[in-house]
């Protein structure tokens, strides 16, 4: 059993990225599906699919790389969990983080759902900072 399923998801993605895996399987949850949707929309992963297995389900993430199979370059350069179960990090709308001076994204969970820092600025809401990705 994991004490932090989101950190487990991010670690699986990070490890698959390091060894240039084509896909990675993650135990599913609604929050993880929303995070995968943001990663797809922002161009960090190719796609994801939900696979029903009779239990909680599996999210299969198709990793994305630049270049040919021989000269691959990673699209995800860094992925970090910010708010942890032992120390939650919340920000208000005036203090929304900019990751790598706008080159990366912060994923937040807000009253409006799971969104990026850019969307939170547009809507004008704050929330819990889940992760930084660049």
Swiss-Prot record:
It comes from the Bacteria. PROSITE patterns: RIBOSOMAL_S8. GO terms for molecular function: rRNA binding; structural constituent of ribosome. Part of the 30S ribosomal subunit. Contacts proteins S5 and S12. This is Small ribosomal subunit protein uS8. The gene is rpsH. Keywords: Ribonucleoprotein, Ribosomal protein, RNA-binding, rRNA-binding. One of its GO terms (biological process) is translation. The keyword RNA-binding applies. The keyword Ion transport does not apply. One of its GO terms (cellular component) is ribosome. InterPro entries: Ribosomal_uS8, Ribosomal_uS8_CS, Ribosomal_uS8_sf. It holds the Pfam family Ribosomal_S8. One of the primary rRNA binding proteins, it binds directly to 16S rRNA central domain where it helps coordinate assembly of the platform of the 30S subunit. Belongs to the universal ribosomal protein uS8 family.
